[in-house]
UniProtKB/Swiss-Prot annotation:
UniProt function note: Condenses 4-methyl-5-(beta-hydroxyethyl)thiazole monophosphate (THZ-P) and 2-methyl-4-amino-5-hydroxymethyl pyrimidine pyrophosphate (HMP-PP) to form thiamine monophosphate (TMP).
GO-annotated biological processes: thiamine biosynthetic process; thiamine diphosphate biosynthetic process
InterPro entries: Aldolase_TIM (IPR013785), ThiamineP_synth_sf (IPR036206), ThiamineP_synth_TenI (IPR022998), TMP_synthase (IPR034291)
Binding-site positions, 2-[(2R,5Z)-2-carboxy-4-methylthiazol-5(2H)-ylidene]ethyl phosphate: 143-145, 173
Positions of Mg(2+) binding: 78, 97
NCBIfam families given in the database record: thiE
Source species of the chain: Nitrosomonas europaea (strain ATCC 19718 / CIP 103999 / KCTC 2705 / NBRC 14298)
Coiled-coil regions, chain positions: none
Protein name as catalogued: Thiamine-phosphate synthase
Record carries keyword Magnesium: yes
Residues binding 4-amino-2-methyl-5-(diphosphooxymethyl)pyrimidine: 45-49, 77, 116, 146
Co-factor binding comment: Binds 1 Mg(2+) ion per subunit.
EC number(s) given by UniProt: 2.5.1.3
Amino acid sequence: MVPAAEPMKQGGVSGLYAITPDMADTGRLCDAVRQALAGGVSWLQYRNKTADSRLRLVQAAEIHLLCRQFQVPLIVNDHLDLAMEIDAEGLHVGGDDISPAVARCHLGQDKIIGVSCYNQLDRAIEAEEAGADYVAFGAFYPSMTKTGTYQAPIELLTAAKKKLGIPVVAIGGIDLDNAGMLIASGCDAVAVSQALFGAQDIQSAARYFSELFD
């Protein structure tokens, strides 16, 4: 378990929400995460679809230590057992994962639960009713990390903000050229992976994304 540190940021999901890339080299991954955190990431999701359970545990635990240093909440993608083992700040679940209500029973009231809602506003409404703390829509643009996903119209963000009382995250193919349009349409946060961790200067890229919310 990660040792206690300074209190985490308060409030709902907002700003730059970084999602880690699939990377087997833990040292390189942690270095990239450190740069992103130094650049102003507000929330970080650990996601590695290619790692086995042992590597995920090692990587998530080390990344959690980094997040604690920067007082940034760590959300674990999909794996409830991993989120519980490292005492992560939250869990993100997709369409084929456990329900937010079940996740809440296991994690307790103080953890953050996010739900992928693709292009489905009804699913987002149900997620909020089931106790989700935020919902994510997308992909809004072609994405290297979210292949074969639903295409979401930008207008969905405006509609969601009118219907929901929880933060809305946009995801899928987001870069510095299109993030501003999504933010202007009402999303509280943009979830970014390739445009951040694939940048030559990760820290600067994180700063540029963060400044879009100023």
